């Protein structure tokens, strides 16, 4: 018996040019875990990664069919309105074979029955944490040649029973390293799953069905490292846990021990954690053991917004955490929702002052990131439900799994749209400039100009944000649109776009 794991294409769109919120980073290991589970069940395995593919539907389906799988399981990551492509591929597979067609991952878990209705050729979905479900499903499929109704399996026309979370993460197999992951010199690895937070914008607790963090035995983590480091050359580690540092003294000591493990491997590492897990002494210890980067989801510089989105942290805690990272010399990456749907213009300006106070608006890429992000609303999320109940959900029949929303203050929405377009122009322009730098290494040209004008671009983005906020306070919408055009022209000129 053979299972084929498929990573679906994820085309880049202008509207979501710099968005990564369609899946948590932990999803990068999903296919590897599925393949490892199947191998333990005695199944032949194959992985087809079309994440960056530009093939058409017919060619994609032909490659999948050529593998001769008994089950084809799509790790279906939401691709910003391009779901029709996967639906077409599924229809071709269904017409030309008797293969069982399934999907798993965050997007299928959130979308569930709506996805089964959208993709009528899809036979089943593995909802939520899937490893034990798949481990139980494969032997039964070998015996019966059909997908059994099991906890964690959503079948068309059948009632669904959820599966309990895995009690001991140490029993998980070592994931295969496949697809795009093999092209990176950094190794993604998980020391825990889940998060004790319940932020309203986050999908993690929806995926697992609870706000709970589970850790694995460190001996199993060390075994996984030994196995995966023996497969290929690795330059660094990245811990993809939603929150690397847990609560309490024991969890802080555990984080320190993981740092010592990374040091014994001779590898620098990065991680993500909640603000309330940070203290400077621990960060200094981690830095001493090789920590080079940390991602903090601070999300806002307003206590009122932090309360609305259920962050359970304060701006003072954020200040302390950011300064602790800065003092330890660890590279800081930030999650920030500038345009929270209920924001006021005053809160936007408060956010700006907060970021300036902490010295976070000094580098153009980070400035562009921090001054433009709004909240992503996908089908099945808490935000979809809440905006729907308030009559604020803006649906588009072309995008059945993604929605916009009405800002409580329309002027905030105007500034958000303007900054979104300006920063999209910036990121797409910088991509082109960097590509030209790589293609013509001996021609300084635009690449050198982009480097030289970095300070000017940074100042321009900041000035645009403040000017748009001030204009939205007192002027009609047309004035905001006119101002956006002025700044777009300045941005084009500064970057020397042709």
How should these model regions be labeled?
Residues 30, 34-37, 44-162, 380:
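Glycine-rich beta-alpha loop elements in corrinoid/cobalamin-binding modules
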Residues 59-60, 254-260, 344-362:
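Short, electropositive alpha-helical surface patch
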Residues 12-15, 111-112, 197, 247-249, ...:
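Flexible glycine/acidic-rich beta-alpha junction loops that bind and position SAM and/or redox cofactors
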Residues 112-119, 282, 342-357:
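Catalytic cores of alpha/beta
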